[in-house]
Every structure is written in C-alpha cells, then in structure tokens.
C-alpha cells in the first residue's frame, strides 16, 4: 500500500507540475487570437538576435542598454552593440538612447581589449554622432579615439571604424580643434594605408581643410615627400579627386583670409613646401591634361595659384 500511495503522489505531482508549466507557457505566449498565439515579450538577450529586424522602442532599448552594461559575456556584448548600432541609425532612437544615458555605456566599450567589441562600439557611436546633441557627449571620446586610431592594426576594421567616427565628429567646425595634435599622424596614416584607409583619412582631412582656422596647422605639419605621389595621374580617382579637393580647400581658405600662401612662414619639409613647390606645380600641369573631366577641372582651378 505504501508503495502504491507513493506512486500516486508522484503522479499527482507530475500532473500539477505540467499544469504549472502550461500556465507559465500561456502567460508568456499570451492569449490566442484567431487560432494564432501572440509573439512573447522579448527578453533583453532576445533583442540581440540577428534575425530581429524591427526598430526597438524605448522600453526595449532600455533593456538592451541594461544588458550591455551588466554582462561580461563578449558574445552578448558584441551582439548588443550591433543591435544598438543598427537602431542608432534612426533619428528617433538617437535621441532616446542619449536620454536613457546610453552614450557613456557604449563609450566605455571602446576601452575593450577585444578588437571586435571595440569596433562595434565605435560603429554605434558613429551612428549616434549623426545627432548634433549627441556630439556634445561623444566629444569626450575624441582624444582617445585619435590615439587608438594610430595604435590600431593598420587597415583594420577597428581602425576604419575610429576614422569614420572622427570624420562624423568633424563635419562641423565645433570639435575640429580636438584633432589639432593629430594632423601629422593622419598624414602619416594616409601614406601608409591601403586604398580604403586612404579614402577615409582624406574624408577626415577634407573636413579639416574647409575650416580656415585649421589651415595654418595643416600647412605647417611635416609630411613625407611621398605625399605628392597622390597627385600622379594613375592614382585611383576616389583618392586623386579627394587629394585635389584638399589642395583646393586650402587655397580657398587662404583666399577667404586674404592671405597668400607665400606670406606665411613655414618650415622646410612642411605640407606647404610640398603643395607650393615646383614638383607639385608640374603634377598640376600634367593633371590639367587628364582624361577625367573632374580631375582636369580641379587641376586647372589649382594651377593658376602657381
């Protein structure tokens, strides 16, 4: 009898347990509508699922930020940063993430020794930086990003992510002064990098070259003479046109300030000596006969300055 009673209690327990599990299941799945179950409320980790393409709402972003701040799991951290970065591409979410205190949470991740996590954090900050109000909070990371860009592996994804963020942060003149001490390093990177790195560095330098307040600093920087190879006719147009625009912008800024390049004293070996020297003049004359119309026009616009 005792054995039968025990078996009966076990059976009852299994039935009750199954019933409780079913209740929890129904609570999380929600009531049926037309024979179909509602999708359950997603947990923070569910929101990092790569297949989740919806734009997150404020409550979901809050969960995601909490997860990002609290987890030590590198896989979850990386997924959370990717999801956050994707959502930061939308203007509404750029403001929401800032208001939720998300920028410092993301910003702290650029200190990660994990290069992939660091890259994803920089990408997220890059998308967030499109919002002007966000830039006031992101600016504190600019000096570190400048240092890291020069220390990161050459032509790496993390280096390009840092350069993209710096490019976004220098679209206006507000924070360009934060890069004043990094100009020489940018020119060095321009000469060492591959095509993708060269293009991204040139985009950044073009932003700086449009600001008259940065002109003297650009012209005074010491640059290797191999810089002039960027003005060779066989250079890819995406690089050549940007290099020509850089020169054109500097000329325009000098004109705006009512100064001629030769009126400003610069040391030998500076960008000034390269741009306004005879070798560069010869290259401009050669480019004035270039087969590409855009290259030809820019070269002709620069040529009269010699």
From Swiss-Prot:
Cystine bridges: none
The organism's place on the tree of life at top rank: Eukaryota
Keyword vocabulary terms for this entry: Endoplasmic reticulum, Growth regulation, Membrane, Mitochondrion, Mitochondrion outer membrane, Phosphoprotein, Transmembrane, Transmembrane helix
Membrane protein topology class: Single-pass membrane protein
TM region(s), chain numbering: 7-29
Protein's cellular compartments: Endoplasmic reticulum membrane; Mitochondrion outer membrane
SUPFAM superfamilies the UniProt entry points to: ARM repeat (SSF48371)
A Pfam family of this chain: Arm_2
Residues with PTM Phosphothreonine: 48
Subunit structure: Interacts with the DNA-binding domain of p53/TP53.
Protein name: Armadillo repeat-containing protein 10
Gene: Armc10
């Amino acid at each position: 009898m005792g054995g039968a009673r025990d078996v009966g209690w076990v059976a009852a327990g299994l039935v009750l347990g199954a019933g409780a599990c079913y209740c929890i299941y129904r609570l999380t799945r929600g009531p049926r509508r037309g024979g179909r179950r509602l999708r359950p409320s997603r947990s923070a980790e569910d929101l990092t699922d790569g297949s989740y393409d919806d734009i997150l709402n404020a409550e979901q972003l809050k969960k995601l930020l909490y997860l990002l701040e609290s987890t030590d799991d590198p896989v979850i951290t990386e997924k959370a940063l990717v999801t956050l970065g994707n959502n930061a591409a939308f203007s509404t979410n750029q403001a929401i993430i800032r208001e939720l205190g998300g920028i410092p949470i993301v910003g702290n991740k650029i200190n990660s020794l994990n290069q992939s996590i660091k890259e994803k954090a920089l990408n997220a900050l890059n998308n967030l930086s499109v919002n002007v109000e966000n830039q006031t909070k992101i600016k504190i990371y600019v000096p570190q990003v400048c240092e890291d860009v020069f220390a990161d592996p050459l032509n790496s994804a993390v280096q390009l992510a840092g350069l993209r963020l710096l490019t976004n942060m220098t679209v206006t003149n507000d924070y360009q002064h934060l890069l004043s001490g990094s100009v020489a390093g940018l020119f060095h990177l321009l000469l060492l990098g591959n095509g993708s790195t060269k293009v991204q560095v040139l985009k950044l330098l073009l932003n700086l070259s449009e600001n008259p307040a940065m002109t003297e600093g650009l012209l005074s920087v010491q640059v290797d003479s191999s810089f002039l190879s960027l003005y060779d006719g066989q250079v890819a147009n995406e690089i050549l046109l940007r290099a020509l625009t850089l020169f054109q912008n500097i000329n325009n800024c000098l004109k705006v300030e009512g100064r001629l390049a030769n009126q400003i004293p610069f040391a030998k070996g500076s960008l000034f000596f390269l741009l306004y020297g005879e070798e560069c003049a010869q290259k401009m004359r050669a480019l004035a006969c270039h087969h590409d119309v855009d290259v030809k026009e820019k070269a002709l616009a620069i040529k009269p300055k010699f």
